[in-house]
């Protein structure tokens, strides 16, 4: 019998760095296997799950732009990096016999399906894990914004933000400020007004306008994805 989850449908946002582990670059096989096991465990519950991965472990568009590259070109390279991460995660999930589909905003039919909203929803209804890659297909938009947009499009109940270096939202960087306070609950407007670096302001505003809650937690602790889906109080919950 499937375990009961708090949410019917969730979007899990993973930074590229979360897949790199301590090295901060590339794909750590141990980390991606752990993430895949956690996602597969959720997929067996009565919860539909879509995943969005960043590409910062391979390439950051902003870094390229800062070094003098054309911003559009640099961002498209970042989108391709997310596809590499998505395929790696898909492979790990399928090794666990978890039915998975990668949908990309930039068509590359030899390796993934093109993103079509109704197709994505149908895959979720069939209890397949859906991995969204290549951002929204346009430069200047982050994968945080992708997570917000896709969550709205597939009518997800919540965005789960798995972080690799922090276990929630703090008033300041806990690595720098020993007096930093961890929030258990925030509103979207608080997050924007206080300049808390949970996600970029475009994504934050979109979540606020569309009443999409966020749960920010550490991805590095085994079982946290399931705990979040079950409704356990972990990390920081951000609501309207």
UniProtKB/Swiss-Prot annotation:
Species the sequence originates in: Staphylococcus haemolyticus (strain JCSC1435)
Region: Involved in allosteric activation by GTP, residue numbers: 21-26
UniProt-listed Pfam families: AA_kinase
EC code(s) of this entry: 2.7.4.22
Protein name: Uridylate kinase
Catalysis performed (reactions): UMP + ATP = UDP + ADP
Regulation: Allosterically activated by GTP. Inhibited by UTP.
Taxonomic path: Bacteria, Bacillati, Bacillota, Bacilli, Bacillales
Cell location: Cytoplasm
């Amino acid at each position: 019998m499937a375990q009961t989850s708090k949410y019917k449908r969730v979007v899990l946002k993973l930074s590229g760095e979360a897949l790199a582990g301590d090295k901060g670059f590339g794909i750590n096989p141990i980390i991606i296997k752990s993430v895949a096991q956690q996602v597969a465990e959720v997929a067996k519950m009565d919860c539909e799950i879509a995943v969005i991965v960043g590409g910062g472990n391979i390439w950051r568009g902003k870094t390229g732009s800062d070094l003098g590259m054309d911003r559009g070109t640099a961002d498209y390279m970042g989108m391709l990096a997310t596809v590499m991460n998505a395929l790696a995660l898909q492979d790990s999930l399928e090794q666990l016999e978890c039915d998975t589909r990668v949908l990309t905003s930039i068509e590359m039919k030899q390796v993934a399906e093109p993103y079509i909203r109704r197709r994505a929803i149908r895959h979720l209804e069939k209890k397949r894990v859906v991995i969204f890659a290549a951002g929204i297909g346009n430069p200047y938009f982050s994968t945080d914004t992708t997570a917000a947009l896709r969550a709205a499009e597939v009518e997800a109940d919540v965005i789960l933000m798995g972080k690799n270096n922090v276990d929630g939202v703090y008033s300041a960087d806990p690595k720098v400020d020993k007096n930093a306070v961890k929030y258990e609950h925030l509103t979207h407007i608080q997050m924007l007004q206080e300049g808390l670096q949970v996600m970029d302001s475009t994504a934050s505003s979109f979540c606020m306008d569309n009443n999409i809650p966020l749960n920010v937690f550490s991805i590095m602790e085994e079982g946290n994805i399931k705990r979040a889906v079950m409704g356990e109080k972990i990390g920081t919950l951000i609501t309207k």
